[in-house]
């Protein structure tokens, strides 16, 4: 077995991410396997943790160490930041003749797949290398980085937490760059939550106004094409009364078209990201290069 027990030696190819045990690990193999086939074009950044609890001093949460693999990935490889959190439980088979040196292959069970916008990651204890993970259901995990991981791996997690909170220079956290949608979860506070809509920046209002106008025009054009097609089919078979009834039933269609268009404008983070968009020229999150790992 390799030094990092969760990483089989068969996939230890040359490369800093693989050698550190943060790329092409067991969690990546699991979700890319035919059983799941999830995010097959995206790289998974992962590490092995031990779940701990605090009772005066940090100690293992269970009598036997609860090993958890925590990872992040992107639902679309072209996204500049990860948007999916993955958690898997690791169990080691125990037999009557098994010892620490003869343990068999670990059993990986995928336990959580969560959008990162519904998860709060926090560096809770730097000296003990402990992360605090809180989910949308208020479930809180305290995870200590496995001792086999070098300190550099924990620095990667520190950088990831900072990126998720503040964003990269290519995201809307940089006021010099304007996008029509948000790539980073907004950090709500009392001042912004109570601010009326009219007090938002003019650039944000104008951008949203343009999108609303475009959505309404698109909806009206679709409605117009639908009416033309309907009139052409019924021109020789229906009476004037039938045609007038068709016009009357078209009004609900306008509201049905308009509502989803407006509803999509309230989405943030990654829902509106276009994987084919070439204007951003954003670095791929799966590259795990200078944009993520840092110097």
Swiss-Prot record:
Keywords: Golgi apparatus, Phosphoprotein
Biased composition (Low complexity): 190-206
Keyword Lipid metabolism belongs to the record: no
Residue positions, PTM Phosphoserine: 220-221, 251, 255
Stretches the record annotates as Disordered: 187-206
Keyword Phosphoprotein part of the UniProt annotation: yes
InterPro entries: GARIL-like_Rab2B-bd
Domain of life, per lineage: Eukaryota
GO biological-process terms attached to the record: acrosome assembly
Subcellular location: Golgi apparatus
Pfam families, A to Z: GARIL_Rab2_bd
Record-level GO cellular component terms: Golgi apparatus
Oligomer status and interactors: Interacts (via N-terminus) with RAB2B (in GTP-bound form).
Family according to the record: Belongs to the GARIN family.
Entry function: RAB2B effector protein required for accurate acrosome formation and normal male fertility.
Name of the protein in question: Golgi-associated RAB2 interactor protein 1A
Gene: Garin1a
């Amino acid at each position: 077995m390799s030094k990092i027990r969760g990483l089989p030696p068969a996939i230890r190819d040359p490369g800093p991410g693989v050698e550190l045990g943060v790329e092409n690990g067991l969690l990546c193999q699991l979700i890319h396997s035919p059983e799941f086939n999830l995010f097959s074009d995206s790289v998974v950044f992962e590490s092995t943790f031990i779940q701990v609890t605090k009772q005066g001093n940090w100690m293992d949460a269970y009598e036997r160490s609860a090993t958890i693999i925590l990872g992040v990935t992107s639902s679309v490889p072209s996204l500049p930041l990860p948007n999916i959190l993955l958690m898997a439980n690791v169990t080691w088979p125990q037999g009557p003749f098994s010892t620490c040196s003869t343990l068999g292959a670990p059993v990986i069970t995928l336990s959580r797949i969560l959008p990162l916008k519904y998860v709060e990651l926090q560096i809770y204890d730097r000296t003990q290398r402990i992360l605090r993970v809180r989910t949308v259901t208020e479930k809180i995990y305290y995870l200590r980085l496995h001792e086999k991981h070098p300190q550099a791996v924990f620095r990667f997690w520190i950088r990831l937490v900072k990126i998720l909170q503040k964003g990269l220079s290519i995201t809307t956290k940089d006021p010099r760059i304007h996008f029509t949608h948000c790539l980073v979860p907004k950090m709500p506070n009392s001042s912004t939550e109570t601010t009326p809509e009219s007090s938002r920046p003019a650039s944000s209002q104008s951008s949203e106004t343009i999108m609303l106008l475009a959505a309404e025009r698109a909806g009206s054009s679709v409605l117009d094409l639908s009416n033309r097609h309907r009139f052409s089919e019924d021109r020789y078979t229906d009476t004037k009364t039938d045609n007038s009834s068709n016009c009357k039933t078209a009004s609900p269609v306008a509201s049905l078209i308009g509502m989803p268009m407006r509803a999509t404008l309230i989405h943030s983070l990654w829902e509106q990201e276009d994987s084919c968009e070439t204007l951003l020229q954003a670095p791929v999150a799966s590259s795990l290069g200078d944009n993520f790992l840092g110097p």
